[in-house]
Amino acid sequence: MTDTEHPTTEANRRASTPQEIDIAAVSDVVESVVANVETVMVGHHDAIEHIMTALLGRGHVLLEDVPGVGKTMLARAVATSFDGTFKRVQFTPDLLPSDVTGVNVFNQQTREFEFRPGPIFANVVLGDEINRAPPKTQSALLEAMEEAQATVDGETHEMPAPFTVIATQNTVEGDRAYDLPMAEVDRFMKKLHLGYPEEDDEVDMLGRVVGRHPIEDLQPVISLEDLRMARAATADVTVETPVREYATRLVTYTREHAQLGVSPRGNIDLLRAGQARAVLDGREYVIPDDVQAEAQHVLAHRIRTGGERDGQEVVSEALERVRVE
């Protein structure tokens, strides 16, 4: 991704202000990103769409799975599809918080301290193998993810807009891994699992990557202004009271049937993801189906049961037992 100008796309041609954006045009822009990423990631259409709904809903994404299934490649492909800044942070046990946020350095010529921003200051930040870093370093992301800013030595520095974190973590790190604190987990709008590709998809993938990897030739297909407008349009999607009430009943069910249920932040993320899902379907309003389509990926990782059940089971029960009224 670069900071260069990008040709105006249809979303910009049809609208001069966010309120005037054609939802169908935004949907077309999103589909162009999905198609672009699929030239690199074969057989993961649903995961790519879920990342896009998180981006439209101003959320962050956690990709969790076994090593080697393409988590980092997927994050890179999505980030490369936008014409903005992209930074990667490889989390390791010896990584310091200042390695993420940046430091103040004394300038001998000006006799003043100057801030040197860390890699967190980018439009799309890839936090690779985030669970390999100790909790203190992981916490460097908290303020940035929640408030789009970082405080270093008492001074607050704003993140570029838009700002999104796509983090990966492996599930088989054992003693070398640290559990993510719940305060950090709750800041991810979605948690996704890629899984292994289908046999035909894997054969197709091998044919694409044996020689020159397609990620090397991947180009941006939308500009930052496109993404800003798409986010603004998504925020304008109507969420009627019955849909808000339905989402709240789902969230309340998780609180009543788990040791730790979904937070109000999770409820907000559920509706924002529902707005983005409506945009993908070309609608200017959210329906219960949108909420249901996003519920597992938005809610399950925020739930702690304290028993044999996991968050996905609790969400499945909620979707089955909570009625749409």
Predicted segment positions?
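Conserved C-terminal "switch" segment of AAA+ ATPases
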Residues: T9, I23-S27, A177, L194-L260, ...
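C-terminal engagement/docking regions of AAA+ P-loop ATPases
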Residues: E10-E20, E256-E325
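Conserved AAA+ P-loop NTPase core
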Residues: R88-I120, R176-E184
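Canonical AAA+ ATPase core
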Residues: N107-E112, A133-T137, E146-V221, A230-D236, ...
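Pre-Walker A (pre-P-loop) alpha-helix and adjacent loop at the N terminus of AAA/AAA+ ATPase modules
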Residues: I23-V61, V66
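Walker A/P-loop
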Residues: L55-P93
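Conserved alpha-helical scaffold flanking the Walker A/P-loop in AAA+ ATPase domains
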Residues: I51-T53, F106-L126, I130, E155
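Walker B catalytic acidic pair
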Residues: D65, D128-E129, A140
